[in-house]
Design a protein with these regions (language model features):
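Active-site or metal-binding loop neighborhoods of secreted/extracellular toxin and effector enzymes
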Residues: 2-23, 51, 91-200
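Long, low-complexity, intrinsically disordered regions
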Residues: 4-8, 33-48
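Metal-centered catalytic cores of metalloenzymes
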Residues: 20-27, 34
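Short, exposed beta-strand/loop patches in secreted or surface proteins that constitute
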Residues: 48-55
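Short pre-active-site segment immediately N-terminal to the catalytic Zn-binding motif
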Residues: 55-70, 94
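Solvent-exposed loop/turn segments at secondary-structure junctions
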Residues: 65-67, 84, 111-112
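Active-site recognition of the HExxH zinc-binding catalytic motif
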Residues: 68-82
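Surface-exposed, polar/charged faces of alpha-helical domains
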Residues: 84-91
Length: 200
């Protein structure tokens, strides 16, 4: 049989997964009740999921390849609702940080642990606790690149940022873009920029 410790661990993991799934359902309800319009689309073969803004219609597209990937990308759409993510005038996301990605991978793990534990990183994420900012930064894509690492293609911030973050927080989050931010006023935040689409 199972030891009481092993049994408690299994029950604990199930309870965490249930709480995560309930949180994902709550996010879906928020999106469904939002004044923001969302669309769903499947990725093509070999494409990554993502959340983008159609700048002609202001509809946010949640693009996904599997149900587990949908839970991940839908979490990012929920981050738009809370002001943790915004969009540029070209429809690309802004303010994504490693904590946003950590939350999305945890939500995905809650739905399908194997869809996350099978990913290549610095360690195997076989529990919620193993999905950390460092684990996210170590994730490798199909080409072996680390998109969430410092300077990676995903332009992922190092600290939590949102539409109210000041210039100094943005410099801390994106030090590779510090030169661009330094000329801005100290009380600057992303909401003061023309053409930025965020939840009002």
């Amino acid at each position: 049989g199972w030891s009481s410790e092993k049994l408690a661990g299994k029950i604990g993991n199930k309870a965490e997964r249930l709480a995560s799934l309930n949180s994902s359902i709550g996010t879906m309800e928020t999106l469904e009740g939002s004044t923001q319009v969302y669309s769903l689309s499947h990725t093509g073969y070999g494409e990554n999921g993502g959340v983008t803004l159609n700048t002609s219609t202001n509809v946010i597209d949640i693009k996904f390849g599997s149900t587990a990937n949908f839970v991940h990308e839908m979490t990012h759409a929920g981050q738009f609702e809370t002001g943790d993510v915004a969009f540029t005038n070209t429809g690309m996301s802004l303010l994504q940080d490693v904590y946003d990605e950590t939350a999305a991978y945890k939500a995905q793990f809650g739905y399908s642990p194997s869809s996350v534990s099978g990913l290549t990183s610095t360690s195997v994420a076989n529990s919620f606790g193993a999905i950390t900012p460092a684990w996210v930064q170590g994730l490798k894509d199909a080409t072996g690149s680390t998109p969430y690492a410092v300077g990676g293609s995903a332009n992922t911030g190092l600290i939590p940022v949102n539409i109210n973050s000041t210039r100094d927080a943005l410099i801390q989050a994106y030090p590779w873009n510090a030169v661009k931010f330094r000329g801005l006023p100290a009380n600057y935040n992303i909401r003061t920029l023309q053409g930025i689409y965020y939840k009002r």
